[in-house]
C-alpha cells in the first residue's frame, strides 16, 4: 500500500496544463502587485509627507476591492469566466499604465493616484473571484487541496521577494519604473491565461444582479457548514492583524531595526512551511474538526506571542501561528469549493474573500483602539485570548462543521 507523503506534491503543475498556466500568471501578477504596493505609498508620502494620505489610499483601494469582489462574484456566476478573468487583468494593466504616465509628469496628480487606485482595486478583485470560481473546473474537486497549497506557497514566496525587488527599483529608477514594470507584468500574464479552456458558468435563470448577490448571502447564512467556514476565515484574518503592534512590541523587547524584520517574516515563513507540509491534509477524514482545532491553536499562539520574555520566542509563536493558520486556510478553501453548489461558486468565493479583507481591516482597527488604552503586550494577548474564547464557543456551536466527515481520496503511486 502506498503512503501519502507529508510534503506538498507539485505533480499538478505537470499533469494539468491549465493550472500550470494559472500558476505562472499568478506568480507574475504577485510580483507585479508587489512592485505597485511599494511604489504607491512611497510616492504619496514623498508628495504629501502625510501618513494619513497614505492610509487613505489604502482604504480607498480596499473599499474598491470589496465592491469588486461582490460584483465579480455575480459576474463569475453569469458570464464565461475566462472572459471575465482576461477583461479584469487587461483593465488592471491600463490602470498601471496610467500610474506610470502620471509619475512621469513634472507634477504628478495625487487625485489621479487615488482614482487609479480605485480602478485597479475594483478590477483586480473581479479577476480574483472569477479565477477562484473556475479552479474546480481546471483541476477537479479531488485536487483542490493540492492546488490551494501550491497557490499559497506561490503567494508567500512572491510576497517576500516582490517588495525587495520593488525597493531596489525605487532606489535605481524611481516609482515610474515600478509602475511601468507592474503594467508590463500584468499584460504578460494574459499570455498564459489565453491558453485556458472555455470556462462557462453553470446554467441558471436570469435575475437582477442585486437579487443574485442576496441569494449568495442567504445561502451563506442558511448553511451552517459553509457559513461556519466563512466565519472562521474572518476571525483568522482578524488575528493576523497583530502586525500593527510589531513596532510597539519591538520597543518593548528592545529589538534592533534588523531584528524587527524577523517579526514580519515569521508568519509568512510559518505559512510557507504549512503549505509545504500539507501533503496529508486532503486525506483527513474529519477536516471540519481539524480546521476548528488548528484555528484555536493559531489564536492561542497570538495570545502567547506578546507574553514572551524574549523576542525570539515571540517569533516562534508567530511562525506557529503562520503554520496553523495555513492549515486552517487550506481546509477552508477546499471545503468551501467542494461544499458550495456550482451555481453559487462565484458569489460565495467573492463573499469569502471579501470577509477576509474586512476581517483584516476590523482587526487592525480593534488592535489600534486597544493599543490606545492598553500596553502593546496586553493588546496582543487580549486579542489572541479573546479570539480563543470565541473560537471555543464556535467549536461547541458549529456542530455540523465539527462532525463533518469525508471519504479520503484514493492514494495512487503518483501521489506518494
From Swiss-Prot:
The keyword Transmembrane applies. Residues 43-55, 105-109, 178, 240-256, 308-313, 378 are periplasmic. Keywords: Cell inner membrane, Cell membrane, Membrane, Transmembrane, Transmembrane helix, Transport. This is Enterobactin exporter EntS. It comes from Shigella dysenteriae serotype 1 (strain Sd197). One of its GO terms (cellular component) is plasma membrane. Component of an export pathway for enterobactin. Belongs to the major facilitator superfamily. EntS (TC 2.A.1.38) family. It is found in: Cell inner membrane. The chain crosses the membrane at residues 22-42, 56-76, 84-104, 110-130, 157-177, 179-199, 219-239, 257-277, 288-307, 314-336, 357-377, 379-399. Residues 1-21, 77-83, 131-156, 200-218, 278-287, 337-356, 400-416 are cytoplasmic. It is a multi-pass membrane protein. GO terms for molecular function: enterobactin transmembrane transporter activity.
Amino acid at each position: 500500500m502506498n503512503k501519502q507523503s507529508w510534503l506538498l506534491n507539485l505533480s499538478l503543475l505537470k499533469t494539468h496544463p491549465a493550472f500550470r498556466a494559472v500558476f505562472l500568471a499568478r506568480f507574475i501578477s504577485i510580483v507585479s502587485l508587489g512592485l505597485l504596493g511599494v511604489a504607491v505609498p512611497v510616492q504619496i508620502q514623498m508628495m504629501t509627507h502625510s501618513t494619513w494620505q497614505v492610509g487613505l489610499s489604502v482604504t480607498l483601494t480596499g473599499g474598491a476591492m470589496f465592491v469588486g469582489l461582490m460584483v465579480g462574484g455575480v459576474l463569475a456566476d453569469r458570464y464565461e469566466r475566462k472572459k471575465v478573468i482576461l477583461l479584469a487583468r487587461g483593465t488592471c494593466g491600463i490602470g498601471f499604465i496610467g500610474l506610470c504616465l502620471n509619475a512621469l509628469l513634472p507634477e504628478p496628480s495625487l487625485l489621479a493616484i487615488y482614482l487609479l487606485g480605485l480602478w485597479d482595486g475594483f478590477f483586480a478583485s473581479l479577476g480574483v473571484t472569477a479565477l477562484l470560481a473556475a479552479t474546480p473546473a481546471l483541476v477537479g474537486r479531488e485536487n483542490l487541496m493540492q492546488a490551494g497549497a501550491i497557490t499559497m506557497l506561490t503567494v508567500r514566496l512572491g510576497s517576500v521577494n516582490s517588495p525587495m525587488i520593488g525597493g531596489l527599483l525605487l532606489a535605481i529608477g524611481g516609482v515610474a519604473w515600478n509602475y511601468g514594470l507592474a503594467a508590463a507584468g500584468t499584460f504578460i500574464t494574459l499570455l498564459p491565461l489565453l491558453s485556458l479552456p472555455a470556462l462557462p458558468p453553470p446554467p441558471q435563470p436570469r435575475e437582477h444582479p442585486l437579487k443574485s448577490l442576496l441569494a449568495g448571502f442567504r445561502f451563506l447564512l442558511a448553511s451552517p457548514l459553509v457559513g461556519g467556514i466563512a466565519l472562521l476565515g474572518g476571525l483568522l484574518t482578524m488575528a493576523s492583524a497583530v502586525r500593527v503592534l510589531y513596532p510597539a512590541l519591538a520597543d518593548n523587547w528592545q529589538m534592533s531595526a534588523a531584528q524587527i524584520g524577523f517579526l514580519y517574516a515569521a508568519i509568512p515563513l510559518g505559512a510557507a512551511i504549512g503549505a509545504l507540509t500539507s501533503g496529508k491534509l486532503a486525506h483527513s477524514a474529519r477536516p471540519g474538526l481539524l480546521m476548528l482545532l488548528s484555528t484555536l491553536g493559531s489564536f492561542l499562539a497570538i495570545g502567547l506571542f506578546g507574553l514572551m520574555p524574549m523576542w525570539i520566542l515571540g517569533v516562534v509563536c508567530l511562525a506557529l501561528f503562520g503554520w496553523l493558520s495555513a492549515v486552517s486556510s487550506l481546509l477552508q478553501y477546499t471545503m468551501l469549493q467542494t461544499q458550495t453548489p456550482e451555481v453559487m461558486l462565484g458569489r460565495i468565493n467573492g463573499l469569502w474573500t471579501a470577509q477576509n479583507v474586512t476581517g483584516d481591516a476590523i482587526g487592525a482597527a480593534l488592535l489600534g483602539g486597544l493599543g490606545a488604552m492598553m500596553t502593546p503586550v496586553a493588546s496582543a494577548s487580549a486579542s489572541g485570548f479573546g479570539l480563543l474564547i470565541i473560537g471555543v464557543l464556535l467549536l461547541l456551536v458549529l456542530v455540523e462543521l465539527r462532525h463533518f466527515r469525508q471519504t479520503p481520496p484514493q492514494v495512487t503511486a503518483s501521489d506518494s
